[in-house]
Amino acid sequence: MSELKEVVVVSGVRLPVGSYGGSLKNTPAIDMGAMVVKEAVKRAGIEPSVVDEVIIGQVGEVAENGFVARAISLKAGMPKETTAYSVNRQCGSGLQSIVEAVMEIQTGQADVVVAGGAENISQLPYYVKDARWG
């Protein structure tokens, strides 16, 4: 078995945690995620074109944001050739995206990966069981 490549974190960015129904309730997760990804790339001192992949974890998917990782990647200025995928592992989704980024780099599948989580719980659909049939 070949030796695994070393992985380093070169940048980290986050938004403040808001309150449910608070001042960020109308801000889509894609907008918040793109802001963070763009700033992380800037702080790392790299060009978006060197990012091989974007991995975003998200617990609650909103229909119009069905492919949140790709939408965040494009909105953050990544080239359309940059691959992206979303991860759902409930509360561990953001951490799982980082684990997958590490594995991709260790095994030589990628050199530069942006990973994290994006969520706006205030925008998740409101589920009412049996409301459809009365």
Model-assigned labels for residue ranges:
Residues 10:
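Ligand-binding pocket segment of bilobal, Venus flytrap-like solute-binding proteins
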Residues 13-17:
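Short polar catalytic/cofactor-binding loops
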Residues 50-57, 114:
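Short glycine-rich phosphate-binding loop at a beta-alpha junction
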Residues 1-7, 19-48, 62-134:
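Acyl-thioester C-C bond-transforming condensing/cleaving domain
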